[in-house]
């Protein structure tokens, strides 16, 4: 009876260094598997993730540059509009008697259309930046999930085979049979 109890105690502990045995502690086994999977993901995924983020950063920076160029063009148009405004104001002084209200209305329309154009360029820039950022985040999430899944499947496939399953099942059947003998 003592030998049977000693064999169960031996099966419940980690095997000593240099020997082979089964770890029946499911919680400890899962922690080891998780730490191995996370280590592999961090080791292999770091380079791919940084390359992906660098590429995305370059695209966003290019988009920002393009938006800044558009903004510069809008400012240039604004300056041209201001020059035209000055000209219109000079003409207004000359034609004040004939139609001051008409010139004032034209001036306001010109200013409003210029500011609307500038606001549209600014909104376009902000929407483009926000879209590119969200797209980058979604792609990174998808890439990390795919790599994690591939790594986990690879680890599981490399660790589990038919012989290991059969030996584990046989060991558990033997332990169950020994437990039935003890209770009988």
Curated annotation (Swiss-Prot):
The keyword Phosphoprotein does not apply. F-type ATPases have 2 components, F(1) - the catalytic core - and F(0) - the membrane proton channel. F(1) has five subunits: alpha(3), beta(3), gamma(1), delta(1), epsilon(1). F(0) has four main subunits: a(1), b(1), b'(1) and c(10-14). The alpha and beta chains form an alternating ring which encloses part of the gamma chain. F(1) is attached to F(0) by a central stalk formed by the gamma and epsilon chains, while a peripheral stalk is formed by the delta, b and b' chains. This is ATP synthase subunit b, chloroplastic. F(1)F(0) ATP synthase produces ATP from ADP in the presence of a proton or sodium gradient. F-type ATPases consist of two structural domains, F(1) containing the extramembraneous catalytic core and F(0) containing the membrane proton channel, linked together by a central stalk and a peripheral stalk. During catalysis, ATP synthesis in the catalytic domain of F(1) is coupled via a rotary mechanism of the central stalk subunits to proton translocation. One of its GO terms (cellular component) is chloroplast thylakoid membrane. It is a single-pass membrane protein. It comes from Spinacia oleracea (Spinach). Pfam families: ATP-synt_B. Disulfide bonds: none annotated. In plastids the F-type ATPase is also known as CF(1)CF(0). One of its GO terms (molecular function) is ATP binding. Keywords: ATP synthesis, ATP-binding, CF(0), Chloroplast, Hydrogen ion transport, Ion transport, Membrane, Nucleotide-binding, Plastid, Thylakoid, Transmembrane, Transmembrane helix, Transport. It is found in: Plastid, Chloroplast thylakoid membrane. The chain crosses the membrane at residues 27-49. It comes from the Eukaryota. Belongs to the ATPase B chain family.
């Amino acid at each position: 009876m003592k030998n049977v109890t000693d064999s169960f105690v031996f099966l419940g502990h980690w095997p000593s260094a240099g020997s082979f045995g089964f770890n029946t502690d499911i919680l400890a086994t899962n922690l080891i598997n998780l730490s191995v999977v996370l280590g592999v993901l961090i080791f292999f995924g770091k380079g791919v993730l940084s390359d992906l983020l660098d590429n995305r950063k370059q695209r966003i920076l290019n988009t920002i540059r393009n938006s800044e160029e558009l903004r510069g063009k809008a400012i240039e148009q604004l300056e041209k509009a201001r020059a035209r405004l000055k000209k219109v104001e000079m003409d207004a002084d000359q034609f004040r008697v004939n139609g001051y209200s008409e010139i004032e209305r034209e001036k306001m329309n010109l200013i409003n259309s210029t500011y609307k154009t500038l606001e549209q360029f600014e909104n376009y820039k902000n929407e483009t930046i926000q879209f590119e950022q969200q797209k980058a985040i979604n792609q990174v999430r998808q890439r990390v999930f795919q790599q994690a899944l591939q790594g986990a499947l690879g680890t599981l496939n490399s660790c589990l085979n038919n012989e290991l399953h059969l030996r584990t099942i046989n060991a558990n059947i033997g332990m169950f049979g020994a437990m039935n003998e003890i209770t009988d």
